[in-house]
């Protein structure tokens, strides 16, 4: 609910989604604690329960990399966008690069047992997107759906404070698509 709460505080009408009920409950609690008007619903990003041409903007953060069918998600996101609407997708090649990262004490997964990390790595390799070159893949796909796309590969340092970079050491990028 990070972006959802910020955007609602700026006066926007916001609907945040996640496929995980616990994440939605946590987002609702956080929104309530800060007086946010953001709404939240359990929903699959690859199969949205919204009408066509509903939204002006879709903002996603750290989502696309772990979807089984990211191409379907992009198609759905464009479907629910109004003409001239925008997708802002902040993501990184986590699935592709995570298994190469040093497991130092400053890593996001420092408290996870090695056996569970190995299972995660196996799943990462099964994800379609782990075999692509991103964000180039995203750009080509969205352009094939007739969106106008720009990529910002320098967005990471503007989002993460220096002391937080250890937490997610894979460079973040922004995929901006206009319908």
Where are these predicted regions, by residue range?
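Short proline/glycine-enriched turn/loop segments at secondary-structure junctions
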Residues: 161-167
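A short glycine-rich, Lys/Arg-flanked "PGG" loop and its adjoining helix->strand segment in the class I
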Residues: 71-86
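A short acidic, Gly/Pro-enriched loop at the edge of an enzyme's catalytic core
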Residues: 43-58
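Class I SAM-dependent methyltransferase SAM/SAH-binding core
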Residues: 1-47
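A short SAM/SAH-binding and catalytic strip from SAM-dependent methyltransferases
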Residues: 56-70
């Amino acid at each position: 609910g990070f972006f959802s709460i910020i955007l609602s505080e700026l006066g926007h009408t916001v609907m945040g989604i996640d496929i995980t009920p616990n994440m939605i409950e946590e987002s609702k609690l956080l929104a309530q604690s800060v007086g946010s008007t953001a709404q939240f619903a359990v929903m699959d990003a690859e199969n949205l329960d919204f009408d066509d041409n509903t939204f002006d903007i879709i903002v996603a953060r750290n989502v696309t990399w772990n979807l089984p069918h990211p191409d379907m998600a992009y198609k759905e996101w464009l479907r629910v966008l109004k003409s001239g609407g925008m997708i802002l997708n902040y993501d990184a090649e986590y699935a592709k690069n995570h298994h190469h990262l040093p497991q130092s004490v400053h890593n996001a997964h420092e408290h996870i047992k090695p056996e569970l990390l190995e299972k995660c790595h196996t799943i990462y390799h099964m994800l379609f997107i782990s075999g692509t070159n991103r964000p180039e893949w995203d750009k080509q796909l969205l352009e094939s759906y007739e969106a106008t796309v720009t990529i910002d590969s320098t967005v990471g340092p503007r989002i993460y404070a220096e002391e937080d970079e250890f937490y997610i050491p894979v460079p973040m990028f922004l995929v901006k698509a206009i319908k």
